[in-house]
Amino acid sequence: MIYVSKPAIISAAGSSSDENLSSLLSGKRFLSKSSEFHPQNEFLVGKFNGVLPSFSNKTKEHFKTRTNALLLSTMLEIDAEIKRAIKKYGKSRVGVVLGTTTSGVEENFEPFKGYIATGFFDKSRFDINRNCLANVAEFVSDFYELSGPSYCVSTACTSGVKAVIEAKRLIESELCDAVICGGVDSLNTLTINGFNSLSILSSAPSQAFSKNREGINIGEGAGLFLLSRDEISNVAVASSASNCDAFHMTQPDFSAKMAISCIEEALKKAGIDGVDYVNLHGTGTQANDKMEAKAVNLTLGATFASTIKPQIGHTLGAAGAIESAICAMLCMDENSTLPPHVYDGEYDESLEAVNLVKSGTKFDVKTAMSLSFAFGGDNAAIIFKRVR
């Protein structure tokens, strides 16, 4: 059995896991308007507006990015647990697997802005090492002087959860005894304008599963765990599953057959027929919500369900990790208040029925599933369970 530490979270809703969970339970939205990513457009984003930790003088220059600053915040939150694992197992037996889609792309965009404005490209301000997706995993390994397996997963919006799945496999295969895992992404010009070009960004707060939904709001953040073969908490990863639609690069298969297969596989591996709570991918796009409602209805029925993206934005490579962290925390508490599904209350009746959580709903969550669906038809599901 692979156990999970109490997770660390940073997002627009706060700088710790406890603050994030409390903020999400309030039902408030933590989105703000920003014009810093396009001179003519103002976007509604989930930006962390607090103070980020500073890098030490020993930190290599290509690690000094906003993405890694968000990650560092979560590292420091579970620092004691990480150091205990390193002391017990040794630096070669602790691995790092992280999901990301951005790495240091915004910092490397600065010289391009200069070129657009002046016609001069300052090569001294561009470092390809910032852009490498492995940058975030290398940062963690360098910070703790680890020599175990260290790599990144970048499968768009499933990156964060698939990093946790990979970490579990590393321990099961006996390549590691503990793994630091999760996901991190920061707001940046490239990603926001890329999504805008697909016409799926909403100028208003996201209304997932509403008949009035217009699209997503982008956010930033990080979710981090320590996974271990030791019983470091009362919650373990019960199972996971992933597959691919092989249908379309930016749209899901509306038959939902592969999403259904993914959910069913995760349930089968866990040896259960259902879960107490499911965290929905819930982007608020026409395509995702249509497919996801069908998949959830046909596999999980009236299970309590909600998405946190309308509150903190879609954090992309961090989303699956943050949402997995919330699921794990719910399992750790014997009398959980469930995260409410925040929207305008006008459910799209053309969708299959989903039991969206109302504010103040309490339930003893012993099992919780998190769902992630990505561009390229990539699907992932993970189940956490309370073991004592």
What are these regions (language model features)?
Residues 1-4, 64-80, 84-90:
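N-terminal amphipathic, basic-rich helices that act as targeting or association modules
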Residues 2-7, 18, 22-36, 40-44, ...:
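Condensing-enzyme catalytic core mediating Claisen C-C bond formation in acyl metabolism
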Residues 84-95, 99, 112-125, 139-149, ...:
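Structural signature of cysteine-dependent C-C bond-forming condensing enzymes
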Residues 249-255, 284-299, 317-322:
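Short glycine/threonine-rich loop-to-helix capping motif typified by GTGT followed
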